[in-house]
Regions:
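Solvent-exposed, non-transmembrane loop/terminal regulatory segments of multi-pass membrane proteins
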Residues: 27-74, 172-181, 321, 419-422, ...
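Pore- and gate-forming transmembrane helices of large, multi-pass membrane proteins
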Residues: 329-361, 708-737
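Hydrophobic transmembrane alpha-helices and their membrane-interface caps
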Residues: 275-321, 658-702, 731
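Juxtamembrane segments of multi-pass membrane proteins
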Residues: 420-541
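Extracytoplasmic
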Residues: 103-267, 271-272, 508-650
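Transmembrane alpha-helices and their membrane-interface boundaries in multi-pass membrane transporters
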Residues: 295, 305, 311-327, 341, ...
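Signature of alpha-helical transmembrane segments and their immediate interfacial
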Residues: 1-37, 389-445, 760
Length: 769
């Protein structure tokens, strides 16, 4: 149908179709969210309660915003001045200081007011059972120790309030609240911890803000104290370092691959036209693919741009097929389209079918990949059909040269009947068997990150100094009301303390005992102070003055006997609100357990399972499980897609030839997996995407050669140029320092080489001349 269209009609049809697609996408466009950088949004929605979702987001936000600055020195006064300078500069740079230290001072006043409601279960039971003699015993024991002689509040002779305060969880063991800091004296040095949060809304902006603030704070400390040590860590700092490394790497990799491809095209075709047409095809394909995704989803994920553009790399095969036939084929320019049409249409059909199957994945990531790739491939094919014939009309004036001839010679030599056509692939597959056995899946997102070793060492040093390792997850206590939720959390913490005394529990119940526990505490004190004479006698029995008994009784009578409430605690320490999750009816509390070393998730999950109303959530584990399902589903969909492609090939070429054409891409797939296993590389979703690319290229090579035959040089040249450009584009990623791109690059490097070298196996063997 397109053969009879005039040149203006072809240009109009192509431009109008592209413009209509872009205009339709513009109606769905949100200017502030054109490119979405939240990778987690690419994961499918979890089948979870609103409380779990809110808790995951709240804990994630607390982690990604925190910046820790640690200043230390031999002289306390100078080190403190340096820490003050660092805190001031960080605040000026936009970081928000943490208020935990000052919150503790306000909490102390609240606890003093409600001190009679703060006994733990064991102390309350002992006083309730022992009465006045039990209190006298506590007072005598307390006063017998040097620390007990110091009555900080003038109303705690038995040390019961002091015991409660001492038992409060310390975020950083050995570090105590000290105004705006947490401070400690250890290893002959004075340490000051500054806790800040980035204030920028966007994650990337927060990383830049945190890095800038830390740099300025480091300089401020150096001015005040040359001999003081400075260290900082936090997710924003790691994110900014990773972003800078990725930007630098992407620039030089892009420049290197672009330069190599331009030199290759210029050397082979000796013309500027291929650069213009191939570049226009790529731009139009990316534009159409992006518009299609925005039209369907309203925005496009940055990871879709990266990997979708990678998959559209297959589309340049269509351009090379046309260029090779036009410049070095046997027919006139007007006959080029007729010569390449069968291979072009068959390659386009099989490619669209393969990627369209990903639409059935049910995963936002794969669905976007599919829409992007299908739209891009269709646009690339449309441009070849409509624009290339009217842009390349004159006979090319480029003579044949060795770079044009050797691909055909290689294909012809590889197609000659020989036992090596059977022996070499079998030998390669036998060598791959140990590699297949060594393959191991890895869906942990931490293994995909490029974290600078120096920053990791600094982070480990800070965590070791603070005696705190970030928890692997968190607990949720869900109940109809707050009091039941607090009680469930108390039961869990008691179980953890009994089974793992080295762990530190951190939750609202550690700062706000449940009302049941508080009422038991108040009842115990009522029992103690029920009989004035018995109280006096008990004190005198231990050699204590009866006036001390009278004072204790008077303080009890004058004290507030009401329970401590959540509102009072939250007003004194607003940070404690992070332990409460607002999601629907009832009450939900978030809590964690930390230790000086890594805490085992399975152990914590076991404690939660043994406590009614409690659950343990491992966010990283959930993400890893989602990536695993994503990888497995993508693999099965690719298999189903290839079964359908097999049917198309059987319909076009017959069963025998279809099997012959499927052999090279499947052989390349097996070789790629074998090499990955030998190298110890993990099998993850990025490897699956690379395998999709490899299968697509291998399929195109087989179709192009089958339609062109071994006796024509243009199909062989097109396949060779495609392989070389793919190696330049994606094989270079093998040297990337980013693990995800590194394994993707290795897979594509091996797979493309294997696809090209095995492509002649798609043709029937020929007899030697």
């Amino acid at each position: 149908m397109s053969r009879g269209l005039s040149s203006p009609a072809r240009w109009s049809l192509w431009l109008v179709s592209l413009a209509l697609l872009c205009a339709a996408a513009a109606t769905r466009l949100h200017l502030h969210t054109v490119v979405d950088t939240d990778i987690l949004a690419m994961l499918p929605p979890q089948q979870e309660s609103a409380a779990v979702g809110a808790a995951i987001e709240q804990s994630r936000q607390a982690f990604v915003d925190e910046v820790l600055i640690l200043v230390s020195g031999d002289d306390e006064t100078v080190a403190r001045r340096a820490a003050v300078a660092a805190a001031d500069v960080a605040a000026t740079a936009g970081l928000e200081p943490d208020d935990s230290g000052r919150s503790m001072d306000r909490l102390l006043a609240v606890y003093q007011k409600h001190r009679y409601a703060l006994l733990d279960d064991a102390a309350a039971a002992r006083l309730a059972q022992g009465g006045a003699p039990a209190l006298a015993t506590d007072v005598a024991t307390s006063l017998a120790s040097p620390a007990g002689m110091v009555d900080a509040f003038g109303s705690d002779p038995g040390g019961h309030l002091s015991h409660f305060l001492t038992d409060l969880p310390q975020p950083y063991p050995g570090f105590l609240p000290d105004g705006a800091f947490f401070s400690a004296q250890k290893d002959g040095k004075y340490w000051f911890l500054i806790r800040d949060r980035v204030s920028a809304a966007a994650f990337a902006e927060g990383g830049a803000q945190g890095t800038r603030a830390v740099t300025e704070a480091r300089a401020a400390v150096a001015k005040v104290c040359v001999r003081c040590d400075f260290a900082a860590t936090g997710a924003p700092l790691f994110a900014d370092a990773a972003r800078h490394a990725a930007q630098t790497e992407s620039i030089w990799l892009s420049l290197a691959s672009s330069l190599l491809i331009m030199v290759l095209i210029a050397y082979v075709f000796r013309s500027f036209a291929p650069h213009v047409l191939a570049g226009a095809q790529l731009l139009a394909s990316v534009l159409a693919a992006t518009a299609a995704v925005i039209l369907v989803f309203g925005s496009i994920q940055v990871i879709t741009l990266v990997f979708g553009t990678t998959l559209i790399g297959i589309a340049i095969d269509y351009a090379f097929l046309y260029f090779a036939e036009y410049w070095f084929g046997d027919g006139a320019p007007e006959q080029v389209m007729a010569a390449v049409r069968p291979g072009l249409y068959m390659g386009l059909a099989t490619g669209v079918v393969a990627f369209a199957f990903l639409l059935l994945a049910g995963f936002p990531a794969l669905t976007q990949f599919a829409v992007f790739s299908v739209a891009g491939l269709v646009e690339a094919g449309l441009m070849v059909v409509l624009i290339f014939p009217v842009s390349l009309r004159e006979f090319p004036q480029v003579p044949l040269h060795p770079a044009v001839l050797w691909p055909q010679r290689f294909i012809q030599a590889a197609c000659r009947r020989s036992r090596w056509r059977l022996v070499l692939p079998l030998a390669a597959l036998l060598l791959c068997i140990p590699g297949w056995l060594m393959l191991h899946p890895s869906d942990d997102v931490r293994g995909l990150q490029n974290l600078p070793p120096q920053m990791l060492a600094t982070d480990a040093h800070i965590r070791e100094t603070l005696g705190q390792v970030p928890p692997p997850g968190f607990f949720l206590s869900q109940a109809p009301d707050l009091q039941q939720a607090l009680r469930q959390e108390e039961v869990l913490f008691d179980r953890v303390a009994a089974g793992a005394p080295g762990y530190t529990s951190l939750g609202l119940s550690r700062f706000l005992p449940s009302d049941a526990r508080q009422q038991a505490s108040l009842a115990a004190w009522r029992q103690v102070f029920a009989d004035r004479q018995a109280l006096r006698a008990a004190f005198v029995h231990f050699g204590l003055p009866k006036e001390l008994a009278d004072r204790s009784l008077a303080e009890w009578q004058a004290a507030d006997h009401a329970s401590l409430t959540a509102d009072e605690v939250s007003a004194a320490a607003p940070d404690l609100k992070t332990f409460s999750i607002s999601a629907g009816a009832g009450a939900t509390l978030l809590s964690t357990v930390t230790g000086r070393s890594d805490v085992d998730s399975a152990t914590l999950a076991g404690y939660a399972a043994a406590t009614p109303g409690m659950s343990f959530v491992d966010p990283l584990g959930r993400i890893a499980a989602t990536f695993q399902r994503l990888r497995e589903r993508a693999t099965w969909l690719v298999i189903l897609g290839y079964l359908l492609i097999s049917a198309l090939l059987v319909w076009r070429y017959g069963r025998r030839e279809a099997l012959r054409m499927l052999y090279p891409p499947l052989l390349a797939l097996g070789l790629t997996l074998g090499v990955l296993g030998w190298l110890g590389e993990p099998l993850n979703i990025f490897v699956v995407v690379a395998l999709i690319l490899i299968l697509g290229l291998g399929r195109d090579y087989a179709v192009f050669l089958r339609e062109g035959g071994a006796t024509r040089r243009s199909p062989a040249l097109a396949v060779t140029l495609s392989a070389l450009t793919m190696l330049f584009s994606f094989g270079l990623l093998a040297v990337s320092s980013i693990p995800a791109l590194h394994v993707f690059g290795i897979a594509t490097l091996v797979g493309i080489l294997a696809s090209y070298l095995s492509a002649p196996l798609s043709l029937p063997p020929t007899e030697r001349a």
